[in-house]
């Protein structure tokens, strides 16, 4: 894996300096976590994005991620995962690898992709560090779909107008990160892995954003209740969601989220969240709380965060999380630093 990354970096850097219609972007995010008792964790994410023009309307896209942490388990035994970058150590995994074709107002991508590239990426939602603001738990909890840090073979279509946009995707029902072996990221096997299809209709006007979506998924539920992740059961489920980012005043937005899952008795059945974000000079703060109903429990998760830009290409983001479950609660603080290396 390390040799592959070095070769990829070398090729991309050379392309950036000598090729036309090519671009490399390197971003690094690191995060210090503490439970204010005895526990600490250091989480890291390295991402490389590479694009190469294959023609007037055709582009080759590739992105890799590498994750590392110093602690083998999370500081909190939470259902929603308070940090949206924390994962097990993965030296190298694909986020995207494929070709995108532009057709007027439309675009079509075919290849390896994870759904975090396209969905739940609007500005207000993206401020928060809770994983549920990156993808609603009704869609992701306990199902190994093409969700960070894994990806799968898929098609992604977009239709863009000034205010309206439509997104539609079809993925292999299970995501992977390995490059070889039976369970590799290039695998497409709907018979055993199932299929995940997603559609989202989006509208924006005067600084406000509105989204409504629907997903169909047939796949395998990871049965952790018996302590044996290998034991799975095939299920079909339907998920609907919607969220609004309403501009209340210049630099002030309200956030409202909701989602419901049917067709299965497992995972997250319903989810609702609300929040407020504000700008203070060049900095941005936010307050968010959500409720997720799992089978057979529930979880409240609240977050206070403040994003402080620096040096034009980076930011520092201190955040405080409070998590409440039946019979347990957690207080977690984190300090996130992120920087995008300027390209030449």
Q: What role is predicted for each listed range?
A:
Residues 169, 203-294:
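Detector for outer-membrane/organellar transmembrane beta-barrel domains
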């Amino acid at each position: 894996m390390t040799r592959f990354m070095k070769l990829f970096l070398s090729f991309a850097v050379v392309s950036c300096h000598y090729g036309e219609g090519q671009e490399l972007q390197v971003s690094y995010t690191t995060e210090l976590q503490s439970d204010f008792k005895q526990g600490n964790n250091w989480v890291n994410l390295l991402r490389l994005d590479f694009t190469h023009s294959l023609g007037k309307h055709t582009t080759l896209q590739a992105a890799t991620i590498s994750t590392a942490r110093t602690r083998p388990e999370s500081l909190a035994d939470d259902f929603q995962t308070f940090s949206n970058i924390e994962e097990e150590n993965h030296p190298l995994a694909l986020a995207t690898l494929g070709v995108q074709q532009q057709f007027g107002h439309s675009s079509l991508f075919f290849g390896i992709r994870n759904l975090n590239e396209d969905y739940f990426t609007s500005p207000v939602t993206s401020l928060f560090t809770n994983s549920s603001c990156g993808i609603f738990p009704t869609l992701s909890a306990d199902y190994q779909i093409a969700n960070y840090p894994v990806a799968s073979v898929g098609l992604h279509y977009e239709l863009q107008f000034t205010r309206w946009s439509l997104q539609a995707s079809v993925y292999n029902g299970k995501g992977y990160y390995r490059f070889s072996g039976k369970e590799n990221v290039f695998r497409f096997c709907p018979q055993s892995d199932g299929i995940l299809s997603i559609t989202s209709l989006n509208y924006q006007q005067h600084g406000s954003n509105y989204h409504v979506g629907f997903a169909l998924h047939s796949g395998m539920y990871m049965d952790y209740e018996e302590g044996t992740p290998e034991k799975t059961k095939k299920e079909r489920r339907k998920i609907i969601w919607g969220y609004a980012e309403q501009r209340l005043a210049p630099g002030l937005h309200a956030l409202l989220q909701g989602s419901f899952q049917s067709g299965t008795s497992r995972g997250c059945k319903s989810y609702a969240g609300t929040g407020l974000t504000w700008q203070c000079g060049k900095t941005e703060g936010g307050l968010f709380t959500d409720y997720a109903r799992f089978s057979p429990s529930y979880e409240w998760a609240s977050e206070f965060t403040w994003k402080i830009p620096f040096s034009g290409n980076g930011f520092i983001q201190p955040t405080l999380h409070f998590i409440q479950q039946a019979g347990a609660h957690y207080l977690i603080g984190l300090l996130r630093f992120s920087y995008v290396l300027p390209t030449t």
